[in-house]
Design a protein with these regions (language model features):
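Short, flexible active-site-proximal loops enriched in glycine and acidic residues
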Residues: 67-73
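An aromatic- and glycine-enriched ligand-binding surface/loop that stacks and positions planar moieties
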Residues: 1, 68, 94, 101-105, ...
Length: 179
């Protein structure tokens, strides 16, 4: 069993670990580079691009969590391109991930309605950005315990929580009422 299935059933081995999502990243990059030529209205283009940026940021964040700096490929690669891309520093990766998330935050709505419910919202992406900033401030990526990383994470998460709550999101008052 591979991926999450292997984890669920206790069958995960070193040979079955599959966390190298450059295929998905390549597909996202192709979509981002070619969407402008498509016959789609601007509002839909903006929405699709924002959602693709979130997915790319999420995929890169998963790799950075495991490996630190990874090669950041932001354009579709042709078959003739060099496969040995230089590894970016962790700080460069985090900055590019945050840039993708910031671009998505600017483009996404606070809430979706109708058939679009369940898509990424501004609140979701702000929460993800806050989480990534906390990871970047943590001992895993901040062994020198630089205070400015913690301050950045705190300031952003506080602002994000206030904006998210002001736009109708929040925590349930009672755990038992969730069910």
């Amino acid at each position: 069993a591979y991926g999450e299935t292997g984890i669920l059933y206790g069958q995960l081995t070193t040979a079955s670990i599959d966390n190298w999502p450059y295929k998905e990243i390549r597909n996202i990059n192709i979509m981002l580079s070619s969407i402008e030529t498509g016959n789609i209205d601007n509002a839909t283009k903006t929405s699709l691009k924002a959602q693709a940026l979130v997915l790319r940021a999420w995929r890169y964040f998963q790799m950075v969590r495991l490996y630190g700096g990874v090669p950041m490929i932001l354009e579709p690669q042709a078959l003739t391109d060099d496969l040995y891309v230089t590894r970016n520093k962790t700080s460069e990766c985090i900055n590019l991930i945050i840039k993708d998330l910031d671009d998505a935050i600017d483009a996404l709505p606070w809430k979706w309605t109708g058939d679009d419910e369940g898509r990424f919202t501004k609140a979701t992406v702000m929460a993800l950005k806050g989480r990534i900033l906390l990871y970047y401030a943590s001992p895993q990526f901040n062994p020198e315990n630089k205070a400015e990383r913690w301050e950045t994470a705190y300031t952003y998460n506080k602002m994000a929580a206030e904006q998210i709550e002001a736009n109708g999101y929040g925590l349930y008052d009672s755990y038992e009422n969730i069910w």
